[in-house]
């Protein structure tokens, strides 16, 4: 097996797991260097862990702004959001089973939609995002409720397995096999901004439960307004619906040991953990006549 050196642009828990997996199987001689960056959009970005591991095992490490020129024949990018000027082949790992969920935050949006399978796709980078030929994928069936942190724990080993299989193929044959995507099956996933973390109480309670779980840690968490204050919903669950003659989404209908049960467009949702902007719990809620917006 003829080893080659590759450049790695890695972020997130998935990037860390791939880093450890590649090192474990192939040693540090396959690393030209590793580049990482902090991510202010999420609570936990694994930058320190990636840097520390590289330093511990003597893999050249660079912060994004100090990134050297890429001279390796192949480059692997995981959870990377910036352009990479690679001379050779650029391999991107994407958080969905392409061609579905091309674009941004595919795992988050997959969980919101209650997809029965989640996974990862390795593809050749292209000018149009996520339209390159597929090098391989891995998938797993999931059940709900499922928090985003749990989903990441599930898919991270798939990243490691897929990358190691691709490297074995590359080192054994000198090249990588690919196949075109089926364009008719393509869907797209939009980027998220602050407004995308806000709960729409007009949605049904099943969707709201998945939404809260999908945007939780390491993301910034689902938000709603209560008496002109933004609060963050950390956990909750669907409870059986009742017949409401004058249904109004967002209003509290019951209180269960200080935990408000909120009317949704369809169904009811009980808030079990919630904090204010200072990170302090707002529960048990003392006021009954509350409407979340």
Residue ranges and their predicted role:
Residues 237-260:
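A conserved acidic, glycine/proline-rich C-terminal tail/linker
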Residues 227-242, 269-277:
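A short acidic-to-branched-hydrophobic micro-motif
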Residues 1-219, 223, 254-260, 264-270, ...:
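One-carbon transfer enzymes
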């Amino acid at each position: 097996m003829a080893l080659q050196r590759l450049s790695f642009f890695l972020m997130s828990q998935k990037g860390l797991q791939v880093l450890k997996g590649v090192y474990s199987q192939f040693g540090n001689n396959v690393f030209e260097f590793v580049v990482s960056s902090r991510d202010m959009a999420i609570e936990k970005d694994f930058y320190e862990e990636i840097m520390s591991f590289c330093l511990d095992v003597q893999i050249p490490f660079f912060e994004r702004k100090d990134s050297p020129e890429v001279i390796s024949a192949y480059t692997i990018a995981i959870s990377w959001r910036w352009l990479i000027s690679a001379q050779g082949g650029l391999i991107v790992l994407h958080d969905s089973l392409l061609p579905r969920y091309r674009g941004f935050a595919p795992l988050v949006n997959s969980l919101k939609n209650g997809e029965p399978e989640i996974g990862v796709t390795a593809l050749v980078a292209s000018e149009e995002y996520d339209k390159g030929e597929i090098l391989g994928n891995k998938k797993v069936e999931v059940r709900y409720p499922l928090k985003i942190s749990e989903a990441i724990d599930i898919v991270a080993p798939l990243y490691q397995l897929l990358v190691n299989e691709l490297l074995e193929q590359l080192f054994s044959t000198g090249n990588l096999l690919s196949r075109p995507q089926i364009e008719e099956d393509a869907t797209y996933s939009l980027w998220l901004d602050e407004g995308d973390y806000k709960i729409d109480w007009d949605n049904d309670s099943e969707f709201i439960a998945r939404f809260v779980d999908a945007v939780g840690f390491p993301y910034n968490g689902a938000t709603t307004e209560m008496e002109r204050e933004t609060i963050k919903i950390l956990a909750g669950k669907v409870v059986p619906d009742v017949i409401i003659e004058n249904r109004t989404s967002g209003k509290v209908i019951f209180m269960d040991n200080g935990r408000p049960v909120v009317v949704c467009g369809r169904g009811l949702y009980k808030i079990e953990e919630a904090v204010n902007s200072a990170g302090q719990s707002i529960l048990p809620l003392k006021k009954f006549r509350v409407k979340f917006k």
